[in-house]
Each structure stands twice: as C-alpha cells, then as structure tokens.
C-alpha cells in the first residue's frame, strides 16, 4: 500500500506544510505525473487545487520531469534537478527517478494553484515553533 509525505507549499505566504497520506488518499497520487493538477482534498485542503512539482523515492533520488515513467535512469546531467555543477561545462552521470508517481515514491512536492474558501493554516494547522 502506498504511503507518502506530501510537502504542500503556499506561494502567497511562503510556508510549507508536510502531511503524511496513506490508503485511499495516497492512491489519488499514483499514476500522476509532475505538472499534473490534483484535488487538495487528499491532503485535507478541501476546495483547493495542487500542482505536483517534484519528489523523491525511497533512496532519496529526485524525480525529474524530463524522464518518462516510474523507473530509475542514469542520465548525463549538466545541471538541474539532482546535480549542481561547480564549474562551467561540468557534467556528471546521476541516477534519477521518472516523473510518474509510484509505490516507490516517498515524498511528493506540491504547490497550491487554486484556493478554497478557508485559510490554509486553519485547515492544516499552523505549527509555530
């Protein structure tokens, strides 16, 4: 059974909320790709719409939007998700996960694209430390 941590970022106030989802709510994410819109009800944000922006698998490999499917793939990267070059022209072979959410995915990053009537902090709880 799928189990994810969904990191929902609110672009208006800059806060990020981490929500653990499993069961039927987690199944709403299976098969979706980065860039897809998802109903916020899966994470407790009724009336909201979320866009999937990234994620990582059980080994910490990042999901890349330019790699198809759910499998891992070795790519030669000159920068972007999974590798930050330190000198001009530097390239590196890295292993990344495809753009589709699967059972191997452990974290999903999402941002709010459409707002509901209630405030995000009221729905998810404001965890001030």
Swiss-Prot record:
Record PANTHER family: 40S RIBOSOMAL PROTEIN S6
One GO molecular-function annotation for this sequence? structural constituent of ribosome
Q: Which family does it belong to?
A: Belongs to the eukaryotic ribosomal protein eS6 family.
The gene designation is rps6e
Tell me the protein's name: Small ribosomal subunit protein eS6
User: From its record, what is one biological process in GO terms?
Assistant: translation
Q: Which HAMAP family match?
A: Ribosomal_eS6 (MF_00512)
Q: Which UniProt keywords apply?
A: Ribonucleoprotein, Ribosomal protein
Question: What is any one of the record's Gene Ontology cellular component terms?
Answer: ribonucleoprotein complex
InterPro entries the record matches: Ribosomal_eS6, Ribosomal_eS6_arc, Ribosomal_eS6_CS
A family per Pfam: Ribosomal_S6e
- List every stretch annotated Disordered: 53-88
State the NCBIfam families in the record.
Answer: PRK04290.1-3
